Amino acid sequence: MKRILAVDDSTMNLKLVENMIKGEYQLELLGSGFDALAYLENNTVDLVLLDLLMPEMDGMETYDRLRELENGKNVPVIFLTADTDIESEITCLKKGASDFVRKPFMPEVMRNRIRRVLELDELTHYLERKVMEKTAQIEKMTFETIATISSMLEARDSYTKGHSVRVAEYSVMLAERAGWREQAILNLQHIALLHDIGKVGIPDHVLNKPGKLTEEEFAIIKSHTIIGADILKEIKSIPEIEAGARYHHERYNGTGYPCGLAAEEIPAVARIIGIADAFDAMNSKRIYRDSLSSEVIRKELVNGKGTQFDPYFLDIFLQLFDEGKLRRRKESE
C-alpha cells in the first residue's frame, strides 16, 4: 500500500484528507513543516500533501528543505491551499511540485489528483529502471566488444597476450583509488583496452623483432600512437579515447612521443595508462627478456617519478603496489 504524508497546521483539514482517502493508502498526518522534516529523516513516503500557508515554516520553505533530505529529494509533492493567487500556483509548479489542490477539498478531485500523481511517479520510476537496464546491457556489450578487439590484436604476439586487459585493470584500480567517478572510470577502462590498437598497422617483423630495433624500426613502432588515434578519432561515445591511444607514451618531463607534451598538457587518462602500461611491460616476459623482479620494478617506477610518470598518480600506484594489489603475471598467462 502506498504511503502518503499529509502536512497541515489545521487538524480539521487533516481529518478531511483522512476521510477522503482512508483505506486506499497508508496515511501519516502531521501538523507542521518541522514535524514533516523530522519524520522524513528516518522514513520514506510515496507522496507528500503539503499545506502552503502554515505558521513558523510555510509550505515553500518546507518544500525547499524537504528536497535537501535523502528521503525527500525525489518524492512527489502536491500543494494544498486556500490561496487563490495564481502566482502562488505558478511558483509551486516551477519549484517542481507535482500538482496544486485548492481548499475546500472536493473528495473526487483530491482522489483523482493523488491517483494521477502516484501513477505518473510509478511510470517514471519504471522507465528509469528500464533505461538503466538497457544502459547496463549496452555497456556490457561495449566492454565485451572492445575486449574482443583487443584480444584479436594481441593474438599476433604471445608475449603481449592479455597486455591491454591488464593495463585496463591497473588503470581502473588507480582511478578508483584517486576518487574518480564511476562513468569516468568506465570510460578509462575502455580507453585502456584500446590504447595499443595502432599496433595493427605495425609490420610483424618489426613488432616481434627479438633484438634491438634500429632507429628506423623504432620510428615505425612509435607511429602506433598516431595510427591508433586515427583509428579511434571518430568514436564520440567514449570521451578521450583518441587521446589515450595518442598520448600514452608521452613523458611527464616532455621527452616522450609523439608530441612531446609535458605535465598537465598530457590528458589524465594517458598519464594513468602510461604508468599501467610501463608496469605491465616490466612485469611481463618479453621476447628479448624475462619479467623483472618486484624490487627492480618498484625501483624503476620510483626513478621515473616526475620524469616519465606523473608524481601524483605514481604515488597512488605505488600504494597499490606496496599493498600487493598488483598481481605478478604468471608465465602461463
Residues of each region from the PLM?
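Active-site beta3 strand of CheY-like receiver
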Residues: 43-50
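Two-component/phosphorelay signaling modules centered on CheY-like receiver
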Residues: 2, 11-29
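C-terminal output helix
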Residues: 101-114
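Metal-dependent catalytic cores of enzymes that make or break cyclic nucleotides
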Residues: 147-333
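Receiver (REC) domain active-site loop signature in two-component systems and cognate sites
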Residues: 54, 62, 66, 92
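Helix N-cap/capping motif at the beta->alpha junctions
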Residues: 29-38, 59-61
